Design a protein with these regions (language model features):
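Acidic, small-residue rich beta-repeat scaffolds with periodic aromatic anchors
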Residues: 24-33, 39-45, 139, 147-153, ...
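Short N-terminal edge-element motif at the start of the domain
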Residues: 62-116
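Solvent-exposed N-terminal domain segments of exported/luminal and surface proteins
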Residues: 25-72
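Bacterial N-terminal signal peptides that target proteins for export
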Residues: 1-11
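Acidic/hydrophobic-patterned starts of short beta strands in beta-sheet-rich repeat architectures
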Residues: 47-57, 114-128, 190-201
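Short consensus segments that form the blades of beta-propeller domains
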Residues: 62-70, 131-137, 215-219
Length: 244
């Protein structure tokens, strides 16, 4: 091995170690309650930036009997590695409602949401789960945020990207339906932001008869493509696409 190749390898190793150290600094915000959610994730599109999220449960003063009915505030921040002061922040009171359909988990989404050549959004996925077995209702909602100066701004509000619902007897008879939505950035744009192509795939399940002789049939609907366009403030969602 030549001295030049040794030097290049050493530089590459040093850079890898420094990057690894920066990424290792990701620390979720401190929790204040058992029902709260806290998480952090490094942002691959911007290697020196980290996203943090803290969702704090606020019990309903009238209807909360078991610590499950209420709302969740949401606080987001983008920080640089090793710096305690955030570069940009966002706070929303009562961002999510939680009752019979309870907030089960949060997830930071750093997929390639490229809205302009120089601007990428990140996402927050909120997973909800219903308490009824015979009337299931599970949903995942996706919201997108962009950094503008020292603020974070929502540009997509609670798009339903997964839903599972139905009505059955818990053994066989009844109907259930699952819809999965995926996003792709379009080649066209509206008000400066790329249009978003949403692909919806719905699968149905119908059961008939008693448990021991249950007959079930699965149906697959043709995928449906829907274009979301930015109106200068937010992406407009068609009826039925926005969650609670």
């Amino acid at each position: 091995m030549t001295m030049k190749s040794i030097w290049i390898s050493a530089v590459a190793l040093c850079g890898w170690l420094m990057a690894g150290q920066a990424w290792a600094d990701c620390t979720p915000p401190a929790l204040s309650g058992e029902a709260d959610f806290s998480l952090c994730k490094n942002w691959p599109a911007y290697p020196q930036l980290t996203i943090t999220a803290l969702s704090t449960f606020v019990p309903d003063p009238v209807y909360d009997q078991d610590g499950r009915v209420g709302s969740y505030d949401l606080a987001l921040a983008v920080t640089t590695a090793g710096s305690p002061k955030p570069l940009a922040t966002y706070h929303q009171r009562s961002a999510f409602l939680s009752d019979a359909i309870a907030l089960e988990s949060l997830e930071l989404d750093t997929a390639r949401y490229k809205l302009t050549p120089d601007l990428r959004a990140f996402g927050v996925r909120a997973h909800f789960k219903g308490s009824s077995r015979v009337n299931p209702l599970d949903e995942t909602l996706l919201s997108l945020y962009v950094k503008e100066g020292d603020k974070l701004r929502s540009v997509l509000d609670r798009l339903v990207v997964y839903s599972f619902s139905g009505e059955w007897d818990g053994n066989c008879a009844g109907e259930r339906s699952e819809t999965v939505r995926t996003l792709e950035m379009g080649k066209t744009s509206s008000h400066g932001y790329a249009d978003i192509i949403v692909r919806s795939v719905t699968t149905g399940l119908v059961g008939e008869g008693p448990p021991d002789t249950c007959e079930s049939k699965t149906t697959h609907e043709k995928p449906v493509l829907t274009t979301l366009r930015y109106d200068g403030e937010t992406y407009i969602l068609p009826q039925g696409f926005k969650g609670m």
